[in-house]
């Protein structure tokens, strides 16, 4: 059984993935709950899919990804 933190992560990530324009507040909350590199990479995959699927991705979304990528790349 998943821990409450893991369940929280999955639920919030699902909301972000399902919403065409997820709120900055919701993404901030998820980022505050990131506990593992795997979670960070999963979250980045969702954000990158959103950017890829949007003809005009928001600057805020692009900035968010650029801020998180170095964390995923660091050992």
Regions found by a protein language model. Give the residues of each.
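Short, surface-exposed, charged/polar-biased interaction segments
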Residues: 29, 33, 47-51, 64-68, ...
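Short acidic DE-rich linear segments
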Residues: 1-6, 69-75
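N-terminal acidic leader/helix
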Residues: 2-34, 56, 63
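Short alpha-helix boundary/capping elements
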Residues: 20, 35-39, 52-55, 70-73
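Short, charged early-sequence alpha-helical segments and their helix-coil boundaries
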Residues: 39-65
